Each structure stands twice: as structure tokens, then as C-alpha cells.
């Protein structure tokens, strides 16, 4: 899978789950499980419920996402 295959969407973190996993509600109303990307983990970027985030979805599994950006 190349980087061109990902779908980027905006969403809001609804709740924290164990192991740096979050429930994210997307703009279109769908709720997905999201995990923090490696760079965000490396730079200790904290994510709290209510934060606006950008997630990447793969076309193969639309129920899971990678959180790549937290809006200020």
C-alpha cells in the first residue's frame, strides 16, 4: 500500500481507550478507532477528549484510523 491510498479526514476525539487508542467521531458522523502515529508518539503529543484531529484511513479497513495531527 502506498501513501497515495490513504483517505484523510477531520474528526473529534470522543474518548480515551487503553494503549494510546481513541474513539474518534469523523465529520460525516462515523465513529472509528484511532491510534497515534509514530511521530506524534515520539514527540509526546498529548491527545484529550474534545481535541480536533486529522486521521488517515486505509481503504481496506474503514473502522480503524491513524491520528496524524492534533489541531491547536
Swiss-Prot record:
Name of the gene: infA1
Pfam families named in the record: eIF-1a
Organism: Polaromonas sp. (strain JS666 / ATCC BAA-500)
Cellular compartment(s): Cytoplasm
UniProt similarity note: Belongs to the IF-1 family.
Any one GO cellular component localisation term in the record: cytosol
InterPro entries reported in the protein's UniProt record: NA-bd_OB-fold, RNA-binding_domain_S1_IF1, S1_domain, TIF_IF1
Function: One of the essential components for the initiation of protein synthesis. Stabilizes the binding of IF-2 and IF-3 on the 30S subunit to which N-formylmethionyl-tRNA(fMet) subsequently binds. Helps modulate mRNA selection, yielding the 30S pre-initiation complex (PIC). Upon addition of the 50S ribosomal subunit IF-1, IF-2 and IF-3 are released leaving the mature 70S translation initiation complex.
GO terms of molecular function: ribosome binding; rRNA binding; translation initiation factor activity
Domain annotation S1-like: ranges: 1-72
SUBUNIT field: Component of the 30S ribosomal translation pre-initiation complex which assembles on the 30S ribosome in the order IF-2 and IF-3, IF-1 and N-formylmethionyl-tRNA(fMet); mRNA recruitment can occur at any time during PIC assembly.
Top-rank taxon: Bacteria
Name of the protein described by the UniProt record: Translation initiation factor IF-1 1
Keyword annotations from UniProtKB, A to Z: Cytoplasm, Initiation factor, Protein biosynthesis, RNA-binding, rRNA-binding
PANTHER family (alphabetical): TRANSLATION INITIATION FACTOR IF-1, CHLOROPLASTIC
Amino acid at each position: 500500500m502506498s501513501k497515495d491510498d490513504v483517505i484523510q479526514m477531520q474528526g473529534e476525539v470522543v474518548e480515551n481507550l487503553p494503549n494510546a487508542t481513541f474513539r474518534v467521531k469523523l465529520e460525516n458522523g462515523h465513529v472509528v478507532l484511532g491510534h497515534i502515529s509514530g511521530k506524534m508518539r515520539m514527540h509526546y503529543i498529548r491527545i484529550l477528549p474534545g481535541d480536533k484531529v486529522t486521521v488517515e484511513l486505509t481503504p481496506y479497513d474503514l473502522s480503524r484510523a491513524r491520528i496524524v495531527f492534533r489541531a491547536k
